[in-house]
Every structure is written in C-alpha cells, then in structure tokens.
C-alpha cells in the first residue's frame, strides 16, 4: 500500500449544493465541475481538490442502465416516484441522490499513478478515519453487496449492510475518486425506487448486461448504523477533521471554475449526451 497522495498536502475545498430544480443544466453542474477540475489538473500543478456536492430527488443512471429493453417505462416509474433521471457519462449503475445523501469527490494529480484498488483503499481509509465509532461495530468493510443498487467491489459496509459506493475516473495522471454516502433519510425507499425502475425497465427480460435484483434492506444510513444523528454538515466537518489528521492544510478554492469557458464546454457536453 503506497502513501496516500493527499497526506501533508494543501487541500482546496469546493462545495456544490443544488436545490430541487427542473433545470437540466443545474442538475448536471456537479458532474461538469468534476470534469473541469480533472482537466484543470492535467494542465496545472494544482490540487488536490475535495468537492462536496448534493442533489435533490435525482436518480443518477449509468450508461449501462440506458441499455434496458423498456427504458421509457423505467423512466416513467422514476418520475412517478418523484425523482428526475439523469445519465452520468461513466460506468456503474443507478444511484439515488436526495436529501441525506452526500457525494464527495477527491481529485488529485500523481505522476506515479496508483492502481485502481489503491485509490479505492485510500477512500475507504479516509472514510474510516472520519467515522472512528464504526470500529466498535467491526469497522467499515469493503466488498460487493450484490443485492444493493450499483453494486461494486468497493462498496463500503457496516455489519454487512452498505452505506456507500465508490467510483473512479482517470485522465492522464489525474485521478478522481468519488463516493456517495447515505447519511440519513429513508434509505429503504431509495432502494425501492431503484428496484421499481429495474422492474419496469426490464419486465423480466434477459439481457447481456447484469442488473441487480435490489433488496432495499441491503443498505442503510451511516447515522442509523452508528446510532448517531448526523447532518450533511456534520459529515463534512468529520471529513475535514480527517484531512487535518493526515497533516493536510485546508483552504477554500478561490477560482470560480463554474464561470470558466472550460466548465461551460463540459456542461454543454453533458447536456448533449442526456
């Protein structure tokens, strides 16, 4: 295991809070901002960045989800359940983003590129450091929770129930490791919403792609797991404290990336691909 690339670094903090909206451009802002930061890092000796972001009542589909045989019926079901579907330009499958879900992107430049697993392990250790109470429950474990939504090898779990999922995006010598963390809210309903999507989008048909048979009970919030009332702000503070324990200096990012031509180009690309 190599040393985390963010230790002893000056971390630039970015936050994007998108309230409930019907504007596609606003829904896609966090994704376009991550892409802008990635491309910025390919050109500049800058970062690392930590980007906190939230969205309200959105189901984020992966490209694979668009291959389902009855996509429109699945999308109609999401809308009937009060969620707006959008598609991210990456692998993985559907995840929910609503009140109580915090997304965190860690973006860094590293000429000696870590393996994919190393980058995932750094994020796991980072989250463990933010929630030391989990040690009394057996710690935060990484393994695939096959009947969760968007299952992956580095699902993070407490007592075998998933609390978070991790994804990666790489470009040249830049890595973006992103995590969605279920902090509070009705996690059971989130699971039911995704299960309903697949039930309506697949209608029992076999496909060459694998989609999960979602068991809503396979996931829970970290608040419920730890028996602590946590807000999104509480978790952000814990993450910042974990960074300082790694010897990091924290500073607010001063560049308004959202008003740069690079961001506008990224946003236009995301909008066109919907």
Predicted regions and their residues:
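Long, positively charged amphipathic alpha-helical accessory segments at protein N-termini or as interdomain linkers
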Residues: 130, 134-137, 173-274
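N-terminal lobe of the biotin/lipoate ligase/transferase fold
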Residues: 1-113
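Flexible, glycine/proline-enriched loop segments at strand-loop-helix junctions
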Residues: 24, 111-118, 226-229
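Acidic, His- and aromatic-enriched active-site or binding-groove loops in soluble protein domains
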Residues: 113, 160-168
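Contiguous, small/hydrophobic- and glycine-enriched helical/loop subdomains that border
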Residues: 102-146
